[in-house]
Amino acid sequence: MSNHRIERVGMEIKREVNEILQKKVRDPRVQGVTITDVQMSGDLSLAKVYYTIMSDLASDNQKVQIGLEKAKGTIKRELGKNLTMYKIPDLTFIKDESIEYGNKIDQMLRDLEKRN
C-alpha cells in the first residue's frame, strides 16, 4: 500500500480521535489529553496513537492510560461512524515522551547559558 495513503489515514485518525476525546468521551481521566501522532501499520490493521497530557505526575499518567484503554471501544465505534474504512484498526495508546525530552534539553541549554 502506498505510504501516502498510510500517512493520510494516520492523519485522519489523529484528527478524529482528538475530536472524539473532546466531544464524546466523558471520562474525567482523559480530560486534557492531546493526540500528537498516529503511526499506522502497512496493512492499516494497527494504529499506534501517541498522546501527551499536561501533568507530569506518574499517577496521572497511569490514570490517563487506564482511561484511554477503557474508552477504546467508544473511540473505535465513533471512528467506524466517521471514517469510510472497511476495518477500523486496533488502537494502541502510547505516551509521547518527545515533548518532555525536548523540554529537558531546553532546560539544560538554559542552564549552560546561565553558567557562561
From Swiss-Prot:
| GO cellular component: a single term | cytosol
GO MF entry, a single one:
ribosomal small subunit binding
Subcellular location(s): the record lists: Cytoplasm
Q: Does the keyword Mitochondrion apply?
A: no
Q: Where primarily located?
A: cytoplasm
* Keywords in alphabetical order: Cytoplasm, Ribosome biogenesis
Pfam families tied to this protein: RBFA
Give one GO biological process term: maturation of SSU-rRNA
Subunit comment: Monomer. Binds 30S ribosomal subunits, but not 50S ribosomal subunits or 70S ribosomes.
Report the protein's function.
One of several proteins that assist in the late maturation steps of the functional core of the 30S ribosomal subunit. Associates with free 30S ribosomal subunits (but not with 30S subunits that are part of 70S ribosomes or polysomes). Required for efficient processing of 16S rRNA. May interact with the 5'-terminal helix region of 16S rRNA.
Similarity-based family? Belongs to the RbfA family.
Know the name of this protein?
Ribosome-binding factor A
